[in-house]
């Protein structure tokens, strides 16, 4: 069997590394390969122009591989990483949505590791590295993965609210939603889907539990939010993790949940040498994540760093939302001019900074002790950084130098 891998990313490299002994050398296609070579394991590294669909039995793309790429158009046996491992996948929980996927997945893992659960997917560990004999797979599941998945399904699908994101990849918000909901048509009567109420009528055989907001979801699962130490925007993530635990074990481990430690880059608070508050929310790459961050600090004047790769999303609603805050904006990245135009239309004060270092310096000239400086850019980072995490590290280094 000849297996072709599209894209030289973490997912495909993990498959090639861990399964080369079972399936023999893989053919790995990537636009960066200009000539045919072999890696240390004997896998062929090929340019996409060398792909012959008649010589390939299965094609597996990296999750974010563009759907309009010529390889996707030519592939006859396309399947996702989830489909490829579905035959050995134990009981699984898939967690998706626009914001909060990672936190909810990590919280659920924190609550369920004692039963032998393992965590993977978009959260960092490819499926090729997960133990097929584990009791449970908890998978953070991106819209990219769902787009390419046509066979696999979970026993529990936990969907957090959906808002516009990755529209340049999916083509439209409608298509983005459709990919998020696509798994429901494969679920059966024994499965459970926790969905925002707006998606309740999506065709599925699964048992649907719908919710309007944090309070409603907590009520549906008899969860006492007073016993949860996390506040918005992480409260919904915590409630969802407890709901998953309740479905699987009929328990609610509040004390264990409250011991969970948040990861970096999400509303990570830092004090500078003058005791002023800076917040690293570099992972906020869409408008709903920024709105959640703004709401958290609504009682303070906010100095917001915004901009980067906007991924083709119209952010007009976000700037209209900002009108209700005491806020000043600092535009960075490839979308600097676009951010300044949004601000002008919304009658918001904005500074043209272009780079993060200049934004931090400019904010430092204005920031008072009772105010907050917030990096919550509403945009991806790859126009100027290798990742959102690097953007966060640069932000923190700039603060140290003040």
Swiss-Prot record:
Catalytic activity: UDP-N-acetyl-alpha-D-muramoyl-L-alanine + D-glutamate + ATP = UDP-N-acetyl-alpha-D-muramoyl-L-alanyl-D-glutamate + ADP + phosphate + H(+)
Top-rank EC class of the record's enzyme: ligase
InterPro entries for the chain: Mur-like_cat_sf (IPR036565), Mur_ligase_C_dom_sf (IPR036615), Mur_ligase_cen (IPR013221), MurD (IPR005762)
GO BP, sorted A to Z: cell division; cell wall organization; peptidoglycan biosynthetic process; regulation of cell shape
Pathway of action: Cell wall biogenesis; peptidoglycan biosynthesis
Localization of this protein: Cytoplasm
Main location group: cytoplasm
Signal sequence, renumbered to the chain: none
Pfam name, any one: Mur_ligase_M
NCBIfam families, alphabetized: murD
Name listed for the protein in its UniProt record: UDP-N-acetylmuramoylalanine--D-glutamate ligase
Source species: Campylobacter jejuni subsp. doylei (strain ATCC BAA-1458 / RM4099 / 269.97)
């Amino acid at each position: 069997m000849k297996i072709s891998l599209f894209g030289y990313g973490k997912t495909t490299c993990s498959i090639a590394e861990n399964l080369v002994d079972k399936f023999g050398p893989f053919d790995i296609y990537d636009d960066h390969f200009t000539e045919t070579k072999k890696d240390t394991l004997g896998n062929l590294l090929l340019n996409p122009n060398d792909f012959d669909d008649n010589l390939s039995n299965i094609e597996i793309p990296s999750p974010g591989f563009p759907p309009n790429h010529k390889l996707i158009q030519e592939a006859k046996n396309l399947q996702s990483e989830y489909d490829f491992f579905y035959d050995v996948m134990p009981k699984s929980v898939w967690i998706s949505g626009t914001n909060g996927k990672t936190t909810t997945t990590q919280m659920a893992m924190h609550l369920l590791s004692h039963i032998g659960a393992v965590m993977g997917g978009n959260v960092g560990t490819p499926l090729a590295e997960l133990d097929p004999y584990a009791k449970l797979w908890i998978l953070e599941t991106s819209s990219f993965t769902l787009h390419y998945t046509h066979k696999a399904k979970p026993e529990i699908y936990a969907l957090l609210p959906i808002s516009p994101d990755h529209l340049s990849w999916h083509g439209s918000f409608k298509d983005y939603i459709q990919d998020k909901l696509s798994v429901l048509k494969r679920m059966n009567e024994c499965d459970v889907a926790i969905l925002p109420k707006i998606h309740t009528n999506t065709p599925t055989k699964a048992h649907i539990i719908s919710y309007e907001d944090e309070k409603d979801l907590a009520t549906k699962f008899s969860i006492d939010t007073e016993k949860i130490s996390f506040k918005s925007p992480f409260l919904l993530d915590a409630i969802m993790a407890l709901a998953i635990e309740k479905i699987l074990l009929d328990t609610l481990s509040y004390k264990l949940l409250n011991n969970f430690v948040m990861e970096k880059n999400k509303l990570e608070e830092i004090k500078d040498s003058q005791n002023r508050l800076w917040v690293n929310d570099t992972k906020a790459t869409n408008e709903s994540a920024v709105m959640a961050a703004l709401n958290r600090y609504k009682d303070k004047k906010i100095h917001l760093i915004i901009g980067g790769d906007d991924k083709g999303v119209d952010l007009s609603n976000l700037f209209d939302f900002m009108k209700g805050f005491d806020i000043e904006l600092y535009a960075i990245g490839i979308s600097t001019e676009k951010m300044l135009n949004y601000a002008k239309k919304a009658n918001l004060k904005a500074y043209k900074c272009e780079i993060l270092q200049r934004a931090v310096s400019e904010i430092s000239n204005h920031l008072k002790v009772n105010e907050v400086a917030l990096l919550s850019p509403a945009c991806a980072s790859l126009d100027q950084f290798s990742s959102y995490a690097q953007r966060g590290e640069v932000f923190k280094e700039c603060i140290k130098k003040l």
